[in-house]
C-alpha cells in the first residue's frame, strides 16, 4: 500500500519519465520539437459537460486566458509512411488532461483514431486518414504508454517498465512495416533532447 502511494506521488510530482507512442496523420515538420500551447477546458454539449475537450491556447495568451494552464510536450518522429502518417514518440513534460491528443491536433497531426481531437476524418470512412491509408486501419485511438522509468520509493533503485503495443496498434505497425526494434525505450535521451 505504501509502495503504491509512493509511486503515485512520484507520478504526481513529475519524478517519472513517461514515453508514449502514437500513429499520427501526416508527418510533423520539423520532425522533432517541443509543443508549448497551454490548455483550457472547453465547454461540452451534454448536461453534465459531456463532450468537453481541451482547447489549445497560444503560449503568449496563457496568463490572460481564464482557466488556462501551461502544457508542454516533446515529440519526435521515429518512422513515417511517405507524407501520409508517422510513428511518433511523445513525452508529456506537464501532465494535463488530453494534453498529447490536443497538442498533436494543434500542430496539424492528430492521432489516428482520435474522434474528439482529430475531427470527422478520424472516423475512417474514406475521407481523412481513412482514405490515405486505404481504410484498413483500426478506428481505435493509436496512443500507447510505451515506457515508464521511475525510482522505487523505498529501495531507491530505478524501475523501467516497457509495455507491448495493444493489438490494434500492433496491426497498424505491421501494415506500415514499422519495425519495433528501430526505436530505443526513450529516443529523447538517445538523441540528446
Locations of the language-model features?
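RNA pseudouridine synthases
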Residues: 1-193
Amino acid at each position: 500500500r505504501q509502495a503504491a502511494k509512493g509511486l503515485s506521488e512520484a507520478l504526481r510530482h513529475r519524478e517519472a519519465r513517461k514515453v508514449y507512442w502514437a500513429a499520427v496523420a501526416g508527418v510533423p515538420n520539423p520532425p522533432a520539437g517541443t509543443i508549448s500551447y497551454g490548455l483550457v477546458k472547453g465547454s461540452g454539449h451534454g448536461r453534465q459537460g459531456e463532450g468537453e475537450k481541451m482547447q489549445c491556447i497560444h503560449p503568449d495568451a496563457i496568463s490572460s486566458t481564464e482557466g488556462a494552464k501551461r502544457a508542454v510536450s516533446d515529440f519526435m518522429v521515429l518512422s513515417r509512411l511517405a507524407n501520409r502518417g508517422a510513428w511518433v514518440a511523445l513525452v508529456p513534460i506537464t501532465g494535463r488532461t488530453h494534453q498529447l491528443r490536443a497538442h498533436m491536433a494543434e500542430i496539424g497531426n492528430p492521432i489516428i483514431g482520435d474522434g474528439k481531437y482529430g475531427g470527422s476524418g478520424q472516423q475512417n470512412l474514406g475521407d481523412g486518414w481513412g482514405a490515405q491509408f486505404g481504410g484498413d486501419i483500426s478506428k481505435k485511438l493509436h496512443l500507447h504508454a510505451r515506457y515508464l522509468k521511475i525510482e522505487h520509493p523505498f529501495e531507491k533503485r530505478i524501475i523501467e517498465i516497457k509495455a507491448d503495443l495493444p493489438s490494434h496498434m500492433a496491426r497498424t505497425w505491421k501494415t506500415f512495416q514499422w519495425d519495433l526494434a528501430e526505436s530505443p525505450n526513450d529516443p529523447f535521451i538517445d538523441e540528446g533532447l
